[in-house]
Amino acid sequence: MSVPVSTQIKQMLISRIDSLTSVQKVYPSSVINNDGWPAVAITPNAEEGEFSSNAENSRVYVFDCMILFPMGQDFVPVEERERTDYAERVIAQVIEDVINAIDTDFELDGGVVLFVNAADVDWQYFDYEGGVARGANVLLKVYTEVTVI
């Protein structure tokens, strides 16, 4: 049985983000634990399809790239001004690194991917077993064409 295209793309994204020095841990699901911060979770969000020709169909695989950093006192250096500000600066750096990593190789090393669209970012707060984390969700849209004949 062949590996689904969505799984192949997810692995490409995980591999690319895992190589960033600003990221401590990448998770293939939304289960986050205390193995390293900032943490990133890559999860499928949606799949979109569109007729392209009699032989090909366009598909868009949408992934959430959730970036989290805890706001607890244990994670903030003493010299920092404030926990929320520090968490937001750490996350902003990871966002920048993720987007730059995708933009510099928007085909994710080729294969099934045509290109990855520019990312939208939504900032949020999250409750997790260790307290509250500041987070940002980077929406990644990966475009492909699939031969149907």
Regions of interest found by a model, annotated:
Residues 1-34, 46-149:
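Charged, amphipathic alpha-helical segments and their flanking helix caps
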Residues 37-42:
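A short glycine-rich, His/Asp/Glu-containing loop-to-beta-strand
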